[in-house]
Each structure stands twice: as structure tokens, then as C-alpha cells.
Amino acid sequence: MKETKIQKRQERILLEALKLFTKKGYYNTSVSDIQAACNCSVGTLYNYFNSKESIAVTLFSNIENCLYEALCEIEKKYSHTYDCFKAVIRHLFETTERNSDGMQYLLYTKHREFMPVEKSVFTSLPFLKIKDMVMKAQENGEIRNIEPDVAVVAILGGPIRMIYLRIDGVLENPLPAYLEECWECSWRSIKV
């Protein structure tokens, strides 16, 4: 019972911090802002996280791990590259619709500014997983044998740009409405 209460409070802190980081920016969000949004004392907040940076790192890690696990499941579910990568894009689009703050934090935030260990979101586990999926598809002759990073950009460049447009409020329709056209453009650039 106590474990659940602790987890709920920690999740609440992370959720409120995510909202503030995406709305105000990391540097414009103070620990006091997070504490006020969570309706808890600063001391309570520090019982869960030792700094604002540790909250940011935990958020990134949680989002990264969820996306990585989803990609692993997609890879297991689909045996054909065409279906697999289309499902990846569908997942990214649906996740953006469900949790735009999470996707904004993952893709927009310049994590290296406050997480010096991180190189780039594009070297994180999910994107390394996608690169691995590309290399396997190339080995199997299912997609063009081009530089793997170029193939990843060909597959995800357009969809990620669509995600940015949706987050920025440029696209009125939900992202899944654009899935077929977006995926066909990506597929044409890598198909054999």
C-alpha cells in the first residue's frame, strides 16, 4: 500500500514536471514551480528527486524506455519490413496524439544542455533499435542497401516532421489521418 502511494506521488511529480518543461522550458521551470504544481512541499519533492536535473533525466529515461519496449513489441509482431516500419510510424503518431508532452520532451528538448551524458535523442535506445531494424531488413534484402543512417532518416524524417507540425498546432487533423500518405513516401525511399 505504501509502495503504491510513493509511486503515485513520484508519477505525479514527473507528470507535472513534464507539463512545465514542455510549456515553460527546462530553464524557465524552477523546483518551486514543480512543487506548487504537485501541491507538495519542497522537502517532499526532494525525498523523491535530488534535483531538477534528476527529474529531467528520469523523465527522459522513462519515455525512452517506453518507446524502446514498444518498438521491440512491434518488431516481434510483424515479420515483414513493410508492415513493421509502418507500425512504428503508426505508434509514433498515436503516441503523439495520446501524449504530445512526452513526444515534445523526447524530440524537441535539447537534453545535452542539462544532461551532459546524453549525446542526442537520435542516439537513444529507440533510435538505435530502429537502426538495428533497418540493418536487419537490409541483410534480408527487404530494403535498399544504403547507409543505415540515411535509411533511418528516409523512414522517419517525414513522420518526425509531421509530429513537429502537429505539436506546433500547424496540422488540424490527428496524425493517424496522414499515416498512409506519410508511410508511402517513406517506403518509396527505401524499397528495393
Residue ranges and their predicted role:
Residues 58, 62, 72-98, 152-155:
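Hydrophobic alpha-helical connector segments
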Residues 65-68, 72, 115-140, 149-153, ...:
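Amphipathic alpha-helical packing segments from all-alpha helical-bundle domains
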Residues 8-17, 34, 55, 59-63, ...:
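Generic hydrophobic, amphipathic alpha-helix propensity
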Residues 94, 128-139, 157-158, 171-192:
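C-terminal peripheral helix-coil segments that are non-catalytic and often amphipathic
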Residues 1-8:
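N-terminal intrinsically disordered/low-complexity leader segments
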Residues 91-115, 162-165:
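Amphipathic alpha-helical segments used for helix-helix packing
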Residues 12, 20-54, 58:
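Helix-turn-helix
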Residues 83-86, 118-124, 139-156, 174-177, ...:
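All-alpha amphipathic helical-bundle segments outside canonical DNA-binding/catalytic cores
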